[in-house]
Design a protein with these regions (language model features):
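Short acidic/His/Gly/Ser-rich catalytic and metal-binding motifs that mark active-site loops
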Residues: 13-22
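Substrate-binding groove of N-acetylhexosamine-processing glycoside hydrolases
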Residues: 2-3, 10, 25-166
Length: 166
């Protein structure tokens, strides 16, 4: 593949990196106040490595992450990074920000493109449903990747991705 997705959204940074003595030493050396700021040198090194190996890096378009607010350290993203919008409800904001910043965008919003979400209410046992909305295949087929914005404002959308997590 010409693309490599670097992930990063599952890292419990504040819990783990605040308890790591090496991380704390690096924070002090770099003058950082929050453990989440360590993502700056991490992603910088990873992005350089991927590009040196003639691949296109892909990152999640993080705007309002719980651990931590990722927009603190990732916007503006480097322009040669393709982003994936996934977080339910925040895709229109990601669409606008990536247009302004010049990043290519893949659309995969959870409320339309997560194909492993329940098809009917009650499809998943309550102990296994952490708040996934019902997302029928009909709803997925009706998805408008441009969210109704003018064509010139969605020219940076490079595709749609349906996701299945297991």
């Amino acid at each position: 593949s010409d693309y490599i997705h670097l992930g990063g959204d599952e890292a419990v940074i504040e819990k783990n990196w605040t308890q790591c003595s090496r991380c704390q030493a690096m924070m002090k050396k770099l003058g950082y106040q929050k453990a989440s700021q360590l993502m700056i040198p991490f992603f910088s090194r990873m992005l350089s490595f991927v590009q040196e190996n003639i691949k296109t890096p892909i990152l999640w378009c993080e705007l309002d992450n719980i651990y931590p607010p990722a927009n603190d350290y990732l916007f503006p993203y480097p322009k040669n990074v393709t982003l994936v919008s996934w977080r339910g409800g925040l895709t229109p904001t990601c669409l606008e920000l990536t247009r302004k910043h010049g990043n290519p965008l893949i659309m995969a919003p959870g409320e339309y493109a997560y194909l492993d979400y329940p098809q009917l209410k009650g499809d998943f046992p309550e102990f296994n449903n952490w708040g996934m909305p019902v997302t029928t295949l009909e709803k997925s087929y009706q998805f408008d990747p441009g969210y109704g914005v003018p064509a010139e404002d969605q020219a940076h959308i490079t595709g749609v991705m349906g996701t299945l997590w297991g």
